[in-house]
Every structure is written in C-alpha cells, then in structure tokens.
Regions:
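Conserved C-terminal alpha-helix-loop-beta "cap" of PLP-dependent enzymes
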Residues: 158-270
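Generic alpha-helical structural element
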Residues: 98, 142, 179-183
Length: 271
C-alpha cells in the first residue's frame, strides 16, 4: 500500500510475476484506512492477473460479508474466506468459517484440511450445521443492524470532533469504525463502556494487556454470547498513540445504540 493506504498498482504489477497468490485483505486490521470497496478489489485482481495470469487471487473477506449487494468473487477474486463468528454467522453460529470460489481451489483447501482425495466428504461438524445455516440465513439483516450502529456511532463521534473512518455519509465496505480516542484513558474508558453495556459479563472492566502477535498492549471489550464474536458489539485497540479505537458489530440497533452512548459517556463525560 501507499502511505495513504491505497493500493500501489505499479508495485503489485512488479511483485506479481512468480507469485502463487495475490492476497487481498478487505478490512483494515489495525490501520487507519477504509475497507477496500469492490471496485478496488477488482482493479487489484486485474493488475495482478495481467502481470501473472497464473496467480490465484485470494480475498480475506472478514467483516465485509453482506455490506454490499455483491461479494469479491464477483469482482475478480478466485477464492475467498471468512469467519462464522463474524458477519456470515449472524450472531448464531458458535464457531467455524467458510471458503468459497473456484471449485478446484476449494477442493484443494478441503484436501489440505482433511485428507487428499477425501476433502469435504470427511471431517467433524461438531453438531453445529443447524446453527451455521440459521445464522447464515439471518446474517444479512444482522449486518444491516451492525451498519446502522456504525453510522450512529460515526455521527456521535463527529459531534465530539472526532474523525471516524468511514464517515456516516460514506459507503461501508465492512462493519468496522475506527477513530482516534486521543488519550489512553479515553480509549480504555470507551472500551469499558462498551463492556458495561454488553449482555454478557457486563460487570467486567477490561484492562490493557500484552497479546501474542502484538507489539503493544491491547484492550478488548466483548460481552458477547459467542466468545470472540465481532458481529456482536465489541471494540478494541492498541495502547499506542494516537490511541485508535476499533468499534464493530451490533446484533440489534436498539441495544447497540445504548452501548455507543454509554461508551461515549464513559470516555468523554465521566465527570
């Protein structure tokens, strides 16, 4: 990516020859950028494929499912994957993930997961298919609630002088909102407010702590029915300047709105 977090198409074309996979992460991770829209994914795929027709275009679609009326496999991706404890599980699926795309590539993934030649015909399901299918059925509506929550939070944060990404009036290509909390105390207070408004473990007060894979301490708030679920209202952020907070999820707008209000109050109006 360029310093402004847009794809460097010249560098992509330079690096593509000889590469087996072009990996596109749709959502932002711990960076301050918008999620890639479908047109950008298409352009990255076209650039890589022109430089290397044999490259597999893979999209990590986490947080992006059902935010638009189409998915990356319709915009240049050969294969994509995501998690059922995020958007496509609808807050109901307790575990799992999905892989979708070209049949030959999906079969190769199944062979690697289970056994060559047996693929998806083998393997345990942990008695979860019903919940997975039910969650997937509800997922588009749940994602709509999460986006409504994001837009509400973005409006609220702008009234406080913050600069959320994305803005309420911009296209939403994932369910995440990030903004600079300004201070460590505000970041911690916001996360603790989200936790206090959660339906599970609302009595807990999250604190920053070291996390494997991160260079800074991280604070995470998630009072969710499913451990690790981020389609449920949650937020987190690394304890480093400018103390960026990442807010996502919301199974229903009514409860999530209360969570946003409590988080803002706890971060900026404690006195």
């Amino acid at each position: 990516l360029k310093p402004d977090f847009t794809p460097d198409y010249d560098l992509i074309a330079q690096k593509a020859p000889g590469a087996k996979v072009c990996h596109i992460q749709r959502s932002r991770g711990y960076t301050q950028r918008n999620a890639f829209d479908l047109a950008t994914i298409q352009k990255v795929a076209d650039t890589a494929r022109k430089a290397n027709p044999n490259a597999v275009i893979f999209v990590d679609n986490c947080y992006g499912e059902f935010t638009q009326t189409a998915e990356p496999v319709a915009f240049g991706a050969d294969i994509m994957a995501g998690s059922f404890i995020k958007n496509p599980g609808g807050g109901i699926a307790p575990t799992g993930g999905y892989i979708v795309g070209r049949k030959d590539l999906v079969e190769l993934c199944a062979y690697r997961l289970n056994a060559p030649g047996l693929g998806k015909e083998l393997g345990c399901t942990l008695e979860t298919p019903r919940d997975m299918y039910l969650g997937f059925y509800y997922a588009p509506g749940v994602v709509c609630e999460a986006i409504k929550t994001a837009i509400y939070a973005q409006c609220m944060l702008e009234l406080l002088g913050k600069k959320p990404i994305p803005r309420y009036c911009e296209a939403h290509n994932d369910i995440v909102t990030c903004f600079d909390a300004g201070t460590a105390e505000a970041l911690i207070g916001f996360c603790q407010g989200i936790q206090a408004a959660s339906p599970v473990d609302s009595y807990a007060a999250p604190e920053p702590s070291p996390e494997p894979g991160y260079t800074d301490e991280v604070i995470m708030a998630s009072g969710s029915f499913t451990q690790g679920s981020t389609i449920e209202l949650s937020c987190d952020g690394p304890l480093r300047e400018p103390y960026t907070c990442y807010l996502q999820g919301g199974l229903n707008f009514a409860a999530s709105r209360a969570g946003v209000l409590l988080a803002v109050q706890n971060a900026y109006f404690k006195d």
